[in-house]
Design a protein with these regions (language model features):
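A solvent-exposed, charged loop/short amphipathic helix patch at secondary-structure junctions
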Residues: 5, 100-115
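Short, solvent-exposed secondary-structure capping/transition elements
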Residues: 95-103, 167
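General secretory precursor processing signal
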Residues: 57-58, 82, 134, 152, ...
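Short, solvent-exposed segments of well-ordered alpha helices
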Residues: 77, 81-84, 109
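Oligomerization/assembly interface segments of phage tail-like spikes and tubes
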Residues: 82-97, 150-162
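Small/polar-rich, solvent-exposed N-terminal microdomains that initiate assembly or binding
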Residues: 1-80
Length: 169
C-alpha cells in the first residue's frame, strides 16, 4: 500500500464525490432501460472498459473528463465555482460473431443480428439519456468487432452541481 504525504492542517473538510455519484446514478438508471440483459454492470476506471467477458454482456459508465464551470469574474476571488461539466461514456460490450474453428467467416445473418443487438442498446441508452438526464453534446459510436467482442458507447456531458467551498478545520 503506497504511503501518502501527510495532509497539512488546517485542511479542508472532505468533499462529496459528485462525479462518482453522477456516474452511479446514470448506471443505475441505464439498467432499467436495457432491453437485453447483461451479466456485468460496472463503473469503469480509466479511458477504456474491460472486454474480457463480452459474451455475458457488460453495461458500463466511465468518467472521461471533468471541467469546472466558473463565474465570469472568477479571477477576482476564490470559490467562483458554479458547477462541473462531467464528460461521461455509457455503453455496452457484447459478443460478436467471429471466424469459426475451421476458418470460416461469420454468416451475413449473424453479423446483421450482432449489429441490431448493438443498435438496440444504443436506442435504449439514448432514450434514457434524453429522458432521465440533463445530457448535452450527446453522440454514439460503435467499436469493434474485435476478438469476438463489440461495443458501442454514448459520450455526453452532464452538468453536476457544486458544493459550497469547504471551510478549513
Amino acid at each position: 500500500m503506497p504511503r501518502h504525504a501527510p495532509i497539512p492542517t488546517p485542511r479542508p473538510a472532505p468533499t462529496k464525490d459528485v462525479f462518482g455519484a453522477a456516474a452511479k446514478e446514470v448506471l443505475d438508471t441505464a439498467q432499467r432501460y436495457l432491453s437485453n440483459p447483461v451479466r456485468h454492470v460496472v463503473i469503469s476506471p480509466g479511458s477504456e472498459t474491460v472486454w474480457d467477458d463480452c459474451c455475458g454482456g457488460t453495461l458500463y459508465v466511465r468518467v472521461v473528463s471533468v471541467s469546472p464551470v466558473t463565474q465570469a469574474n472568477a479571477a477576482l476571488g476564490t470559490c467562483a465555482l458554479l458547477g462541473w461539466t462531467v464528460t461521461m461514456a455509457l455503453g455496452t460490450v457484447r459478443c460478436a460473431s467471429a471466424i469459426d474453428s475451421q476458418g470460416r467467416a461469420p454468416k451475413d445473418k449473424d453479423l446483421t443480428e450482432d449489429a441490431l443487438y448493438l443498435t438496440q442498446d444504443a436506442a435504449d441508452l439514448g432514450q434514457m439519456l434524453m429522458c432521465e438526464t440533463n445530457a448535452a453534446n450527446v453522440s454514439w459510436a460503435p467499436q469493434g468487432p474485435d476478438g469476438g467482442c463489440m461495443s458501442g458507447e454514448w459520450q455526453f456531458d452532464l452538468r453536476v452541481g457544486a458544493c459550497a467551498c469547504p471551510e478549513t478545520r
